[in-house]
Amino acid sequence: MNNSQSLYLLWATILNQSQSAEQVLLNTVELFNRLGLNEEFNEKYKKLDYRKIENAMTQKPCLHRFPKNMSINLAGSIYMIDKYYDGTPSKLFEEYDEPQEFKEKLMQFRGIGEHKAETAITIFQTYKKINNNRNLFRNKCGGLYKTIEKEMKILDEFGEDKDYDR
């Protein structure tokens, strides 16, 4: 997964609280649009900070029921990526090895608990064709079963980008 796809999946996971799964997908894409990440990811990502994220989240219509708290979580994810993944979002997913270990990595991000981490892993595994068992979605998360096809399309749309270092 490239940097855009990696950050999208991480942020969609963080934002997946107090709103429907369908709304999370729409709002995460809209957040990328508001921040300019869908067009000039590498340049815009370098300049992200809490203030820019909060402004994008609180612009009408707000992108979450709790936009300021989510802005803190999203900005925190940028700082975690800087500190532990050399400022490169894709490194979080490149280092995927064993599901339990990866779940623990995801749970270090503010706003991601066990269920959200498992959901992100399921989406990642599906996208990378590591696991195509659709019954898993029904058992783990009914919302995911409804949205997995949309999620795959969004990840495809974020497509390939060049190597990136913050």
Label every model-predicted segment:
Residues 8-19, 75-79, 123, 166:
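Short, hydrophobic/amphipathic alpha-helical patches that form generic packing surfaces
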